[in-house]
């Protein structure tokens, strides 16, 4: 499907994955510029930006996942941010990373694939913190995925 047809069909996200982009992302960047030149206003996920992985399959699947969830994550985080502000929250807006740790809402919008398994990670971190607060009692935490 050409770029104009994609725009007419209402495509909102595009994943760009070229086989050697991990070594040189010049062509992926050129495709991004071309998409913008033709008027594509949606989300573009470049495999060279999403993952520096040299393995094509892993880089491609991660980029496709990123492209698939990016619009949804952006809409969700913007709605959540607005609602929290309306409720008077003026602290830091943070999201749990899949690999532990946290990221800002803006980072999560740019790299939503890094949040995919954040629920189980947050559960494990929460159980560990509870154990520490209870003087390191022996604890068993079950996390269902």
Each model region followed by its residue ranges:
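Conserved small/polar residues in nucleotide/adenosyl-binding loops
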Residues: 1-6, 143-145
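Nucleotide/phosphate-binding catalytic cleft detector across ATP-hydrolyzing
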Residues: 4-138
């Amino acid at each position: 499907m050409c770029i104009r047809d994609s725009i007419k069909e209402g495509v909102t996200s595009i994943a760009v994955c070229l086989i050697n982009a991990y070594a040189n992302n010049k062509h992926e960047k050129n495709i991004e510029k071309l998409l913008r030149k033709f008027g594509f206003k949606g989300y573009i996920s470049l495999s060279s930006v999403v993952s520096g992985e040299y393995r094509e399959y892993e880089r491609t699947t991660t980029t496709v996942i990123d492209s698939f969830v990016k619009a949804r994550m952006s809409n969700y985080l913007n709605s959540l941010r607005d609602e929290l502000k309306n409720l008077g929250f003026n602290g830091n807006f943070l999201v749990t990373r899949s690999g532990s740790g946290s990221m800002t809402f803006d980072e999560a919008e740019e790299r939503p694939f890094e949040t995919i398994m954040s629920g189980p990670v947050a559960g494990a971190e929460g159980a560990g913190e509870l154990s520490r607060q209870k003087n390191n009692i022996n604890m068993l935490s079950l996390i269902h995925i």
